[in-house]
Amino acid sequence: MIAVDGPSGSGKSSASKGVARELGLRYLDTGAMYRALTWWFMTENVDPADTDLIAARAAEPSVEVSADPGNPWTRVDGTDVSSEIRTQEVSARVSAVARVPAVREHLIARQRAIIAAARPGVVAEGRDIGTVVAPAAQLKVFLTADPGARARRRAAELSADAGETEAAQARRDRLDAAQSEMAADALLLDATDLTLDEVIEKITRLARERGAGLFIPEGAELVALPGQGQEDKGSWAWAGDQSS
């Protein structure tokens, strides 16, 4: 597998999807899972400061994320929320939800099961993917960029003002500091002056050199998770102890 880590706005998602398409691999956006849960708590009017309630209800919603890098989507209880989870409101709250230990324990277990089930391999991206979720990944890349470049990318994604986005991003970096540690065996890639195609090419070349992503780590437990139709090339679900 290939693990792509890095701060918000560094281009993790776009690069990971591109690499997965180039190599014919599955794709896992771990951040979308945290965002989906955050969005659901917002619709339930749960105070992000109420960590006990968040911990108690973390397994309630059914959340699915697409495994197809060419058709990424996120669903909560069967409803597509791919756009809703990318708002500034969700971005402002997701760090608080992600810091709740019960939430992290629940989602990390799901993410590891998804990675173990992925065939022929997976490009997984998100905070602490290479240090906590998948420390045995064959290739780990820590993607970064200067604050201005990251803010511009995030602003384009959220259709927001770059100046406001940079301030919000700095705040989130402080909140996410514990999950932003670079793995000791990761390769640092500064994308500040690189195009998306150049980033994809560099990671793809490294993966081919190492043979990363073309097999599942030895000893990994296979967990059967149902797909959602040929057009989606499979999907991954987590909902309490059930797949849906």
Show where each model-derived region lies.
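Hydrophobic anchor at the beta1->P-loop junction of P-loop NTPases
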Residues: 4
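P-loop (Walker A) phosphate-binding loop of NTP-binding proteins
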Residues: 7
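Conserved lysine of the Walker
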Residues: 12
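Hydrophobic positions on the alpha1 helix immediately C-terminal to the Walker A/P-loop
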Residues: 15
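N-terminal phosphate/diphosphate-binding loop that engages ATP/GTP or pyrophosphate donors
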Residues: 21-86
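Small-molecule kinase domains that catalyze NTP-dependent phosphoryl transfer to phosphate-bearing small molecules
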Residues: 66, 111-119, 129-136, 160-202
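NTP-dependent small-molecule kinase module
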Residues: 76-82, 149-152, 159-160, 179-244
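ATP-dependent NMP and nucleoside kinases share a basic, alpha-helical "lid"
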Residues: 82-157
